[in-house]
Amino acid sequence: MKVLLELLLGYSVHILAHELPDLPRTQHPPKSELSYWCTYVPQCDFCWDCQDGICKNKITESHFIDSNHSIVNCRVFRDSKTQSCLYEISSKMPNHFSMECLHPRPYTGNEIFMQTWGGGVTINNYL
């Protein structure tokens, strides 16, 4: 199952890099691309649906965290000319994270601060 998931993800990366146009800077990436953007920076606010301090992952719909302060504001954009996928991450120490769309890698910034809710699975297990 894990191998199949990795193959599908690799295929989607290939499609993203070669067939999709530039993505202007946005805080709301297209729904069809959420799984891509949320895989590499899973703490982005657009990856979570938060109500009353409980946040549910939009991709898996089964991972919960209980601290809204763990969620960071993100803007993403894609430059097809340079084959770059970029994140602007706003937290206590705002930064930029860029990667080659064809060779993505996870951001390892503040996910260690995310807290699970009700014995749920941590964010690290969802990657």
Curated annotation (Swiss-Prot):
Instruction: Give the source species.
Output: African swine fever virus (isolate Tick/Malawi/Lil 20-1/1983) (ASFV)
Function, please?
A: Plays a role in virus cell tropism, and may be required for efficient virus replication in macrophages.
* InterPro entries linked: ASFV_fam_110
What family does the entry list? Belongs to the asfivirus MGF 110 family.
Q: Where is the signal peptide?
A: 1-17
Domain of life of the native organism: Viruses
Q: Which UniProt keywords apply?
A: Signal
Name of the protein in its database record: Protein MGF 110-14L
